[in-house]
Amino acid sequence: MKLKPLHPLILLLTVSFLMLTSSFITKVESSEETGNMTNDELLRNVFSAIDNLKTIRYNLQCNERIKGRMQHTESKVKLQVVPRKLYLYIKGIEVLWCEGTNNGNALVNPGSFPYINLNLDPNGSLMRKDQHHTINEMGYHYLEDIIKDGLRKVGDKIDKNFILLGEEKYNGRVCYKLSITFPDFTWNSYTVKKDETLITIARKLHVSEYMILENNSKLDWYNDVKEGDVIKVPSSYSKLTLLLIDKEYMLPVSNKVFDDKGLFETYEYYDMQVNKPFDQKEFTKGFEGYNF
């Protein structure tokens, strides 16, 4: 049987319908991949999860660029948010810090010579050497402040700078992948004010004090500045940040940070336990299994 050719108008309508259907299916599949989540909704959920965080346990793998080379560490962390209490174990080294105790110092078992417990300032040279951060920045509130500052910087351009890239499996768990970009990342001149240090400057600008130290070769330490000095500071915390956000906990479990030189730092969280109450003895030096 010989088929009659389709009328041009019918053919045009058929093609148009197929194109529209194809476009609709593509959009639905893309939306379903992130459960119709927008970047703005995702960030609100992340901030809510952080603000409702009471306790957390996790294993942390950390890579930080120190003097041009990536330095790797692994640690086990127990953290209570309020009042802030922290226990940290790194290859035989133990750190215990509890808010309002020990004159603000951390109790440290060095696990080696001098084989005695030490009381150390978390911001001091012994605890801070070759580290991007101190124990004071552990947890998520520091990261939350940096992200919120990034939102203030981009204003109504959130969809250009904060991009939800879909979902990705991480350590067997489903995560949202979020890209935060500042393509205009640059270095600016900053005049040091009275009583400022690199740490107070970094907190004010929501940038990394280690990055400032690394890029001002004349400075030896974080307090090596005085009023009137002119230093270089970054325009934002990063040029690119890639976050994997656990779909259940709504907390970042992977954080990769890039600056104008490349990879700056990565933090990867494993075996997280969120809001599981602690036995308060776990924040005492005599707790079973500790070696203080």
Where are these regions (language model features)?
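N-terminal secretory signal peptides that target proteins for export/translocation
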Residues: 1-6
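Flexible, processing/modification-adjacent segments and terminal tails
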Residues: 31-42, 52-54, 62, 70, ...
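Amphipathic hydrophobic-ligand
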Residues: 69-76, 263
